């Protein structure tokens, strides 16, 4: 694939995730948009690693590291969301003041 096509696709994914993160009022949707942003960044890592240096796997290894961190972030985020839902019966961001106290 041409480098520009992949970068444009990655930019679209990043912007969709950023728009969803800014406008979403649901915590689960915000976590999904954050994962979309991280996947767009991973796509850039793999693309630049393949385009600039085929012999080394630094971009691919860093991508795997980011995927592992994103999985841990998603698990912790969903645990926090389920705890807030159990206590408040809502997953709306603007109604949750549990962390302010």
From Swiss-Prot:
Residues passing through the membrane, by range: 2-22, 32-52, 61-81
Membrane topology: Multi-pass membrane protein
GO cellular component, one term: NADH dehydrogenase complex
Keyword Hydrolase (UniProt): no
Keyword field contains Metal-binding: no
InterPro entries listed in its UniProt record: NADH_UbQ_OxRdtase_chain4L/K, NUOK/Mnh_C1-like
Catalysed reactions, as listed in the record: a plastoquinone + NADH + (n+1) H(+)(in) = a plastoquinol + NAD(+) + n H(+)(out); a plastoquinone + NADPH + (n+1) H(+)(in) = a plastoquinol + NADP(+) + n H(+)(out)
PANTHER family per UniProt: NADH-UBIQUINONE OXIDOREDUCTASE CHAIN 4L, NADH-UBIQUINONE OXIDOREDUCTASE SUBUNIT ND4L
NCBIfam families in UniProt: PRK05715.1-2, PRK05715.1-4
UniProt family annotation: Belongs to the complex I subunit 4L family.
Record protein name field: NAD(P)H-quinone oxidoreductase subunit 4L, chloroplastic
Organism of derivation: Capsella bursa-pastoris
């Amino acid at each position: 694939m041409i480098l520009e096509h992949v970068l444009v696709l990655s930019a679209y994914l990043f912007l969709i995730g950023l728009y969803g993160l800014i406008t979403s009022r649901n915590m689960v949707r915000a976590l999904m948009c954050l994962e979309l942003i991280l996947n767009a960044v991973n796509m850039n890592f793999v693309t630049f690693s393949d385009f600039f240096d085929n012999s080394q796997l630094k971009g691919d290894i860093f991508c795997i590291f980011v995927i592992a961190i994103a999985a841990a972030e998603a698990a912790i985020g969903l645990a926090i969301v389920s705890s807030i839902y159990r206590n408040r019966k809502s997953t709306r961001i603007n109604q949750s003041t549990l962390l302010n106290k």
